[in-house]
Amino acid sequence: KKTGIVQFSFPHEGDKWATHLVFDEGDISVKLGPSEDEPTVELAFNDIDHFNAFFKGTSMKLPQFRHVHHLNWVVPVVMGLLKMQKLLSASEPPADEETKALMVKLMFYLLPSGISQLNKAGHPEVVKWAKMSPDRVYALVVDGRDDLAGYIRVKAGKTRSARGAYKRSQPFFTMRFTDLDAALGVLLQTADMLALTAQKRLIMEGAPEFGAQIGDFMMLVGQYAQK
């Protein structure tokens, strides 16, 4: 468990674009924009194409490493991110159960977080949806796995995503899976949702029309992740 800040940046249209990860004793939060505090390490890319190609795995050209206060951060952070990107860009589920669980966990973290970030970045459809929403929670869970859960809370234009199950009250809508294969089948769009629903391996708790709406936003995030 580490504590520090890892920043990723590149120049764009005369400005510096950046995002950073804040590590706090095992907890990780994603922040848009440059860090107000000096990063523990910064990965500075030449441009947006270099950034995208590196994390898509189509280029092994390394970025510049700046503010390197702890060399032991660099390799595990980069290797971990590349492994995450490989899993998130996969089109077929992995064979072993451990990697399946890791892929589901990453997607359950990515999708709510991605929707929240699109709202904060001003995506028109997401912003409109968030502004019109009362206080609601949308959740993703796998039965029997407390570690495989994530949610997004929406209220009057503001969004916040988090890992784990939402326990303060019953979520407004929950997409519940009975097993890893059912979850990956839906997340990777390789399974028939109607068939999984009929088999009771996919259970939608809440209003279906709102589930379809949040599902569209999840697909949007997935498309961005694989570009």
Q: What positions do the PLM features span?
A:
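Feature captures hydrophobic
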Residues: 1-227
